[in-house]
């Protein structure tokens, strides 16, 4: 029988180690760049290289990430901002490229308009986790195509005539929504891998629990512990390092409006967890189970819970201590309160340590029970806010490139408080801001303030700002306006609302055949057929000649 010549030849271990050591040094050199001056990696270059395969793949994501980082570095240094909005589809991405230097891909928009299951829904991140990466790929492929199309057109014209032609940078870096990572750490890594493969320059990930994730402007948000979210950020960086990408990682916190947290395991969260300060109440979960056993339902159960919460007098532990001081018979109450606050404020100490400080100062135990108010699902109650968000952002900073605090309102004072709180510890930390369409901008501020809001935020270090759903809303607006007018005045509506404004404003899509790449494809065909084609799409008879 002939020998099997298909068996892989033996690898020389010495050469294998030599190549490994060389690649490790390359990674260490990469990490020594100023790009990573604030980045903390709890893993080694050896660990990263050992997770790579033998075939080195250069991802477009890396070039786009470097471009995005350069933009944000420049904006942050100048206290300026790159601002953009959520893009729906290729037409939109080509028009955005003329005026904006980044592109955003929203999970909310994808959930409602582009789920890979084709089933639309609200922003609960319950769509397949390929959904947003697929939208990134959709847009990035369009960017690449229109870049090729434009280059071909420019190079087909003599050099002295090219200044008359458009020279648009279609390759605007894309930042995309990774929600909560869609699962555990390996899910986060696989999601990151998809984003890099599809061409994303950056992604953001929030500190909500995956199973209960909500849009940032919905109620019922449940946070994960600080360390759990740090683990997600580390997972993103590790996966990007394995793939050799400078992918930007933006840490989002929903702590400003969150009311629940999964566990008390992380002491850095303890100061913001609510406890019952009424020792006469039985645990809420026990009370609710009894009520259900008695046959109570719906509104009756809600009334029982509301009554219990009203009696529980829920407080953060620090609030409970200060309340005891204020209501007690302490001759030096003001001094005690100041000493307690000085001992705990901003220290990220555990509840056990805070109790010991209070006991030493007051000579008594503080009744505070964070177990009894737990929800039926087992979640602990939390009092979020800007201070809670700052606390989390300070912990996330070494593991991400920018930080975003989701907020209820476009509140400049709150944005300033957050920025100052973060920059007091991490002065170089880049910040991001959601200019959300969930805000009622008319009631929030006057038109003059609306016009300057981005610039004012930029002065605080918010170097990347975005309207998450502007693509959705602008599409809805023109669709409603056109459909309404078309139903009444027919083709006059198309002429007045669409075609004439397209021509007047020089919108390239008015020549939609050319915009779609018909000329470019004709040139491909001619290249293959020796320069002649009787079936050229843009040949004699094309109706687009009417627009010359």
Swiss-Prot record:
Induction: By acetate. It is an enzyme of class 4 (lyase). One of its GO terms (molecular function) is methylisocitrate lyase activity. It catalyses: D-threo-isocitrate = glyoxylate + succinate; (2S,3R)-3-hydroxybutane-1,2,3-tricarboxylate = pyruvate + succinate. Coiled coil: none annotated. Pathway: Carbohydrate metabolism; glyoxylate cycle; (S)-malate from isocitrate: step 1/2. Substrate binds at residues 106-108, 216-217, 252, 434-438, 468. InterPro entries: Isocitrate_lyase, Isocitrate_lyase_ph_CS, Pyrv/PenolPyrv_kinase-like_dom, Pyrv_kinase-like_dom_sf. The active site is at 215 (proton acceptor). It comes from the Eukaryota. One of its GO terms (biological process) is tricarboxylic acid cycle. Its EC number is 4.1.3.1, 4.1.3.30. It holds the Pfam family ICL. It is found in: Glyoxysome. Keywords: Glyoxylate bypass, Glyoxysome, Lyase, Magnesium, Metal-binding, Peroxisome, Tricarboxylic acid cycle. The keyword Cytoplasm does not apply. One of its GO terms (cellular component) is glyoxysome. Mg(2+) binds at residue 177. Its cofactor is Mg(2+). Homotetramer. Belongs to the isocitrate lyase/PEP mutase superfamily. Isocitrate lyase family. Catalyzes the formation of succinate and glyoxylate from isocitrate, a key step of the glyoxylate cycle, which operates as an anaplerotic route for replenishing the tricarboxylic acid cycle. Required for growth on ethanol or acetate, but dispensable when fermentable carbon sources are available. Also acts on 2-methylisocitrate. This is Isocitrate lyase. It comes from Neurospora crassa (strain ATCC 24698 / 74-OR23-1A / CBS 708.71 / DSM 1257 / FGSC 987). The lineage of its organism: Eukaryota, Fungi, Dikarya, Ascomycota, Pezizomycotina.
